[in-house]
Amino acid sequence: MPKTKHWHYSIPPEELDDERTAKAFIRELRISPKHAREICRAIRGMPLDRAKEFLRRVIRKEEAVPFRKHKKKVPHRRQIRPGWDAGRFPEKAAREILRVLEHAEANAEYKGLDTDRLYIKHIAAHKGRVIRGWIPRAFGRATPFNTPTTHIEVILEER
Protein backbone atom coordinates (compact mmCIF):
# COMPACT_ATOMS: atom_id res chain seq x y z
CA MET A 1 0.00 0.00 0.00
CA PRO A 2 1.53 3.39 -0.97
CA LYS A 3 2.25 5.90 1.75
CA THR A 4 0.07 8.98 1.76
CA LYS A 5 1.58 12.42 2.23
CA HIS A 6 0.88 13.76 5.71
CA TRP A 7 0.78 17.53 6.11
CA HIS A 8 2.07 18.98 9.36
CA TYR A 9 3.48 22.21 10.75
CA SER A 10 7.21 22.75 11.20
CA ILE A 11 6.70 23.21 14.96
CA PRO A 12 5.54 20.03 16.74
CA PRO A 13 2.17 20.33 18.50
CA GLU A 14 3.78 19.55 21.88
CA GLU A 15 5.65 22.88 21.77
CA LEU A 16 2.46 24.92 21.25
CA ASP A 17 -0.01 26.08 23.87
CA ASP A 18 -3.47 25.52 22.34
CA GLU A 19 -4.99 28.09 24.68
CA ARG A 20 -2.81 30.92 23.31
CA THR A 21 -2.09 30.00 19.66
CA ALA A 22 -3.96 29.97 16.36
CA LYS A 23 -2.80 28.35 13.12
CA ALA A 24 -3.45 28.59 9.39
CA PHE A 25 -1.98 26.59 6.50
CA ILE A 26 -2.58 27.13 2.77
CA ARG A 27 -1.20 24.75 0.15
CA GLU A 28 -0.49 25.02 -3.57
CA LEU A 29 -0.54 28.82 -3.89
CA ARG A 30 0.58 29.93 -7.34
CA ILE A 31 3.16 32.38 -6.06
CA SER A 32 6.94 32.46 -6.18
CA PRO A 33 8.56 30.47 -3.34
CA LYS A 34 11.45 32.95 -3.32
CA HIS A 35 9.17 35.97 -2.91
CA ALA A 36 7.15 34.17 -0.23
CA ARG A 37 10.31 33.26 1.69
CA GLU A 38 11.56 36.85 1.74
CA ILE A 39 8.17 38.21 2.87
CA CYS A 40 7.94 35.58 5.63
CA ARG A 41 11.40 36.52 6.86
CA ALA A 42 10.46 40.22 6.90
CA ILE A 43 7.27 39.78 8.98
CA ARG A 44 8.32 36.95 11.34
CA GLY A 45 8.02 38.09 14.95
CA MET A 46 5.96 41.21 14.14
CA PRO A 47 2.69 42.04 15.86
CA LEU A 48 -0.20 40.98 13.61
CA ASP A 49 -1.55 44.50 13.00
CA ARG A 50 1.88 45.81 12.02
CA ALA A 51 2.52 42.85 9.68
CA LYS A 52 -0.83 43.33 7.92
CA GLU A 53 -0.16 47.06 7.46
CA PHE A 54 3.34 46.28 6.12
CA LEU A 55 1.86 43.90 3.52
CA ARG A 56 -0.74 46.49 2.49
CA ARG A 57 2.08 49.04 1.99
CA VAL A 58 3.98 46.49 -0.13
CA ILE A 59 0.88 45.95 -2.31
CA ARG A 60 0.52 49.74 -2.74
CA LYS A 61 4.31 49.93 -3.52
CA GLU A 62 4.98 52.28 -0.61
CA GLU A 63 7.45 50.00 1.21
CA ALA A 64 9.79 47.40 -0.28
CA VAL A 65 10.45 43.91 1.07
CA PRO A 66 14.17 43.44 1.84
CA PHE A 67 15.58 40.62 -0.28
CA ARG A 68 18.37 39.03 1.75
CA LYS A 69 18.92 35.58 0.21
CA HIS A 70 17.56 35.86 -3.33
CA LYS A 71 19.11 39.23 -4.13
CA LYS A 72 21.08 38.76 -7.34
CA LYS A 73 20.33 41.64 -9.74
CA VAL A 74 17.77 43.09 -7.29
CA PRO A 75 17.90 46.91 -7.37
CA HIS A 76 18.42 49.09 -4.33
CA ARG A 77 15.27 50.79 -3.07
CA ARG A 78 14.65 54.06 -1.33
CA GLN A 79 11.45 52.67 0.29
CA ILE A 80 13.25 50.01 2.32
CA ARG A 81 13.94 49.81 6.05
CA PRO A 82 17.32 51.07 7.30
CA GLY A 83 20.02 48.42 7.42
CA TRP A 84 19.35 46.90 4.01
CA ASP A 85 19.41 48.13 0.43
CA ALA A 86 18.17 45.46 -2.03
CA GLY A 87 14.43 44.96 -2.22
CA ARG A 88 11.33 44.44 -4.34
CA PHE A 89 7.55 44.83 -4.26
CA PRO A 90 6.19 41.25 -4.60
CA GLU A 91 2.50 42.24 -4.80
CA LYS A 92 1.00 38.85 -5.66
CA ALA A 93 2.84 37.02 -2.88
CA ALA A 94 2.05 39.81 -0.39
CA ARG A 95 -1.66 39.61 -1.26
CA GLU A 96 -1.73 35.84 -0.67
CA ILE A 97 0.25 36.00 2.59
CA LEU A 98 -2.09 38.75 3.82
CA ARG A 99 -4.98 36.37 3.09
CA VAL A 100 -3.30 33.61 5.16
CA LEU A 101 -2.78 36.04 8.05
CA GLU A 102 -6.46 37.01 7.92
CA HIS A 103 -7.42 33.30 8.06
CA ALA A 104 -5.20 32.80 11.11
CA GLU A 105 -6.69 35.91 12.73
CA ALA A 106 -10.21 34.55 12.13
CA ASN A 107 -9.17 31.25 13.73
CA ALA A 108 -7.80 33.15 16.74
CA GLU A 109 -11.02 35.14 17.06
CA TYR A 110 -13.03 31.90 16.92
CA LYS A 111 -10.89 30.47 19.76
CA GLY A 112 -11.58 33.59 21.85
CA LEU A 113 -8.08 35.10 21.70
CA ASP A 114 -7.53 38.87 21.90
CA THR A 115 -6.64 39.84 18.31
CA ASP A 116 -4.93 43.06 19.44
CA ARG A 117 -2.32 41.07 21.39
CA LEU A 118 -1.40 38.57 18.64
CA TYR A 119 2.06 38.34 17.10
CA ILE A 120 3.53 36.06 14.44
CA LYS A 121 5.31 33.30 16.35
CA HIS A 122 6.06 31.23 13.25
CA ILE A 123 5.61 31.76 9.52
CA ALA A 124 7.24 29.70 6.79
CA ALA A 125 7.02 29.21 3.05
CA HIS A 126 7.79 25.82 1.52
CA LYS A 127 8.10 24.85 -2.13
CA GLY A 128 5.08 23.01 -3.48
CA ARG A 129 4.75 20.93 -6.60
CA VAL A 130 5.52 22.40 -10.02
CA ILE A 131 2.60 22.63 -12.44
CA ARG A 132 4.03 21.59 -15.79
CA GLY A 133 2.92 23.26 -19.00
CA TRP A 134 4.06 23.68 -22.59
CA ILE A 135 4.04 26.58 -25.05
CA PRO A 136 3.82 25.53 -28.72
CA ARG A 137 6.54 27.08 -30.89
CA ALA A 138 7.33 27.21 -34.57
CA PHE A 139 8.28 24.11 -36.59
CA GLY A 140 6.54 21.68 -34.22
CA ARG A 141 8.68 22.42 -31.20
CA ALA A 142 7.50 23.26 -27.68
CA THR A 143 8.98 25.16 -24.75
CA PRO A 144 8.30 24.15 -21.15
CA PHE A 145 6.28 26.67 -19.14
CA ASN A 146 6.28 25.59 -15.51
CA THR A 147 4.42 27.30 -12.66
CA PRO A 148 5.87 26.92 -9.14
CA THR A 149 3.55 26.58 -6.15
CA THR A 150 4.12 27.40 -2.49
CA HIS A 151 2.79 26.18 0.85
CA ILE A 152 2.49 28.77 3.65
CA GLU A 153 2.05 28.03 7.35
CA VAL A 154 1.37 30.62 10.06
CA ILE A 155 1.19 30.31 13.85
CA LEU A 156 -0.02 33.31 15.85
CA GLU A 157 0.45 33.57 19.60
CA GLU A 158 -1.15 35.86 22.15
CA ARG A 159 1.25 37.91 24.27
Swiss-Prot record:
Q: Which UniProt keywords apply?
A: Ribonucleoprotein, Ribosomal protein, RNA-binding, rRNA-binding
> Cellular component GO terms, alphabetically?
cytosolic large ribosomal subunit
Record-level GO BP terms = cytoplasmic translation
Question: Pfam families per the record?
Answer: Ribosomal_L22 (PF00237)
Domain of life assignment: Archaea
Transferase found in the keyword field: no
Q: What molecular function terms (GO) are annotated for this protein?
A: rRNA binding; structural constituent of ribosome
The free-text function statement in the UniProt record for this protein reads: This protein binds specifically to 23S rRNA. It makes multiple contacts with different domains of the 23S rRNA in the assembled 50S subunit and ribosome. The globular domain of the protein is located near the polypeptide exit tunnel on the outside of the subunit, while an extended beta-hairpin is found that lines the wall of the exit tunnel in the center of the 70S ribosome.
Family per record = Belongs to the universal ribosomal protein uL22 family.
Kindly state the subunit structure of this protein. Part of the 50S ribosomal subunit.
- Name of protein: Large ribosomal subunit protein uL22
